Amino acid sequence: MDRSAGLPVRLLLLLLLLLLWSVAPQALRPGSHSLRYLFMGASKPDLGLPFFEALGYVDDQLFVSYNHESRRAEPRAPWILGQTSSQLWLQLSQSLKGWDYMFIVDFWTIMGNYNHSKVTKLRVVPESHILQVILGCEVHEDNSTSGFWKYGYDGQDHLEFCPKTLNWSAAEPRAWATKMEWEEHRIRARQSRDYLQRDCPQQLKQVLELQRGVLGQQVPTLVKVTRHWASTGTSLRCQALNFFPQNITMRWLKDSQPLDAKDVNPENVLPNGDGTYQGWLTLAVAPGEETRFSCQVEHPGLDQPLTATWEPSRSQDMIIGIISGITICAIFFVGILILVLRKRKVSGGTMGDYVLTECE
């Protein structure tokens, strides 16, 4: 089968999985870290999807992937490429293989409870359906933890696990059959709770230690402020580049005083792909007042806050000078052209009043 034919379906599946992810807790508290796994799969290969595929994220940065066909964990972050022989990686690979098996069993259970399979004389033939799972944990600055485990079926919320009660919350009536079946097996519920409250936080701490050992204590190597023009007006953008860990605070100052939060767009922080991060903060300003504003950055790797301001570059001054010169020259030549045309008009009128006499 042509794999390219399943690409649109794969993109749709990823979109559905992101929708499922969006309802999981993602706004990390300052000093917190997270470990998340996204599982997805299709019941039939005609969708161009594997039976099981897994993506692992630490602090929202992809670091491992796995699929049912290869049955191998693949490193997806530069800082973990050389660690595939470590004990942590071997444990991670074994966990993903176990989840592969459990995912397929759960998939068949859910489809059976939905009557989404056809029974023939020879075998049970499943219909085409999609299962998504998100699970993981967070370790907060005070060393407390929280976990989550959710199932989505055909793009809709299905079940969510509650570690405190060991129960499953059904998102729709047809999920009750699976809920009751899973809650009868208390061993599974206790194992799920132990993973979220013990194993997952331990693994997260190990991954973070490995990441820090490879990257070291990165700090913003460059903080700069740039000016931008648009149809909506003038804005300043503050950029902090190549820092680690992810936690960073960026704020705008006007005349050395912090601006009200309601006047500032929220900061954006994204991974670079090499284990470090970049962040930026924008602010709309009135033309001519750019120099009154400065950007202040705080980061664990800095001894004190770092402040940067916008400064016009020489190239910008040169461009402005050239544009001004061209404008003045254009006005000058237009003025000369108008004078010439006016003189020609006057001369043309005089010539029009003069009549040549006929030759005798």
From Swiss-Prot:
Chain ranges on the Cytoplasmic side, renumbered to this chain: 341-360
Record's GO cellular component terms: apical part of cell; basal part of cell; cytoplasmic vesicle; early endosome; external side of plasma membrane; extracellular space; HFE-transferrin receptor complex; perinuclear region of cytoplasm
Membrane topology (Extracellular): 26-319
Membrane topology: Single-pass type I membrane protein
Annotated region (Alpha-2), positions in chain: 128-218
Keyword list, A-Z: Cell membrane, Disulfide bond, Glycoprotein, Ion transport, Iron, Iron transport, Membrane, Signal, Transmembrane, Transmembrane helix, Transport
Ranges where the record places region Alpha-3: 219-310
Gene3D superfamilies: Immunoglobulins, MHC class I-like antigen recognition-like
InterPro entries: Ig-like_dom, Ig-like_dom_sf, Ig-like_fold, Ig/MHC_CS, Ig_C1-set, MHC_class-I_related, MHC_I-like_Ag-recog, MHC_I-like_Ag-recog_sf
GO MF annotation list: beta-2-microglobulin binding; co-receptor binding; signaling receptor binding; transferrin receptor binding
Glycosylation sites: 115, 143, 167, 247
Subcellular location(s) of the protein: Cell membrane
Domain Ig-like C1-type: 220-309
Location of the region described as Alpha-1 in the Swiss-Prot/TrEMBL record: 26-127
Signal peptide: 1-25
Sequence intervals crossing the membrane: 320-340
Subunit architecture: Binds TFR through the extracellular domain in a pH-dependent manner.
Protein family: Belongs to the MHC class I family.
Its job: Binds to transferrin receptor (TFR) and reduces its affinity for iron-loaded transferrin.
Protein name: Hereditary hemochromatosis protein homolog
Name of the coding gene: Hfe
